[in-house]
Amino acid sequence: MKYDFPKLDLHLHLDGSMLPESAWEMAKERNIKLPADNIEDFKKFIIVTADCRSVNDYLERFEMPLQIMQDSAAISRTAMELVELLASQGLVYAEIRFAPQLHTRNGLTQKDAIEAVIDGVNKGMEKCPSIKIGVICCTMSVGPETANMEEN
């Protein structure tokens, strides 16, 4: 059955949506130790498959993208490429969610991370005016209590 109505995605994790080829390239540029010697084996570490056995197995796939997305350029590029991908799939609206506190390992502030996502989203929407994107900032219940209250 074919449905002729606009497509949208209301729950899309930025750090779980990094293109494998971009992750591979950016990890190499940043001298991040890779868990594989080639892109095909690398994909096994970041792509969730149908035989995923637990939420912990699922969440492990987020670690490599998070290691990479610790600077504004990587965050912005990831957001821009995601917008372009969604537009190419025919979506007209999506809400991208992420936790700014998870992008502060190498000195970025939460504000820096938010600005990088907004920059990438705006660049993506400029290239692909058929799609509109909302950004949702999440607070996490892991780490010190002050991490979500920190003023940037």
Residue ranges and their predicted role:
Residues 1-152:
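Metal-cofactor-binding active-site regions of metalloenzymes
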